[in-house]
Swiss-Prot record:
Function recorded in the entry: Key component of the proton channel; it plays a direct role in the translocation of protons across the membrane.
Gene: atpB
Membrane topology: Multi-pass membrane protein
Record-given protein name: ATP synthase subunit a
Source organism, top-level taxon: Bacteria
Family of this protein: Belongs to the ATPase A chain family.
UniProt organism field: Trichodesmium erythraeum (strain IMS101)
Any one GO MF annotation of this record: proton-transporting ATP synthase activity, rotational mechanism
Membrane-spanning intervals of the chain: 35-55, 92-112, 131-151, 187-209, 221-241
PANTHER family: ATP SYNTHASE SUBUNIT A, CHLOROPLASTIC (PTHR42823:SF3)
InterPro entries, alphabetized: ATP_syn_F0_a_bact/chloroplast (IPR045082), ATP_synth_F0_asu (IPR000568), ATP_synth_F0_asu_AS (IPR023011), F0_ATP_A_sf (IPR035908)
Gene Ontology, cellular component aspect: plasma membrane-derived thylakoid membrane; proton-transporting ATP synthase complex
């Protein structure tokens, strides 16, 4: 029995590090360097796709131009549905940027072999698997819908907090704090959980990589990008909506 236990102790076990970061020091601040690296990679991919699609613009689109125009049409339709015909156009770039960054970030975690690249500490991963990234995106969304409401209604925007009765003011304030929290933690939790589950299974059964689970992860990653962009547009639409007006189409 002791011989069996000693043999087991020498067998290599699968390991997966969580919470290990590659820090960059900026003065007295420490920055998660690996997240900046992967974020720059994602941004570069999006810019490259936009550049290639605009190299030789045709009246009848094909190839990359056709793909990017389809993506733009999808984003425009999503923004219009949530904000409304009257006010949606200025917000298409913002919602589109959110959707594309989150979508490409999520997929990069599943398709790009980040763990092959060794760092002095920590490991590369999808930007959206870091809580700092998702909180930043959620705070940008909060700033956007406050800006939308105040730019259209002035300080009268906050009068909506007292509707339908003044008793609702504390609840409306709490709601404003919970919106970015729910956005950030939903995205962070889903992407991190997906990476951990796939990572553990790949380590445990390296000869039979769980491809079906990876495909499911790609689908769920796309859904998370859609949910975030849809909710962001919906919050902006609520801020722009006139008090007492009927729901926009």
């Amino acid at each position: 029995m002791l011989d069996v236990l000693n043999t087991i102790n020498f067998l290599p076990l699968a390991e997966l590090e969580v919470g290990q970061h590659f820090y960059w020091e900026l003065g007295s601040f420490k920055i998660h360097g690996q997240i900046l690296l992967t974020s720059w990679f994602v941004i570069a991919l999006i810019l490259l796709a936009a550049f290639i699609s605009s190299l030789n613009v045709q009246r009848i689109p094909s190839g990359m131009q056709n793909f990017m125009e389809s993506v733009l049409e999808f984003i425009r339709s999503l923004t219009k549905d949530q904000i409304g015909e009257k006010d949606y156009r200025p917000w298409v770039p913002f919602i589109g940027t959110l959707f594309l960054f989150i979508f490409v970030s999520n997929w990069s975690g599943a398709l790009v072999p980040w763990k092959v690249i060794e760092l002095p500490s920590g490991e590369l991963a999808a930007p959206t698997s870091d809580i700092n990234t998702t909180v930043a995106l959620a705070l940008l969304t909060s700033i956007a819908y406050f800006y939308a409401g105040i730019s259209k209604k002035g300080l009268g925007y906050f009068a909506g907090y007292a509707e339908p009765v003044p008793f609702m003011v504390p609840f409306k304030i709490i709601e404003d704090f919970t919106k970015p929290l729910s956005l950030s933690f939903r995205l962070f939790g889903n992407i991190l959980a997906d990476e951990l589950v796939v990572g553990v299974l790949v380590l445990l059964v390296p000869l039979f990589i769980p491809l079906p689970l990876m495909v499911l992860g790609l689908f769920l990653s796309a859904i998370q990008a859609l949910i975030f962009a849809t909710l962001a547009a919906n919050y902006i639409g609520e801020a722009l909506e006139e008090h007492g007006a009927e729901d926009h189409d």
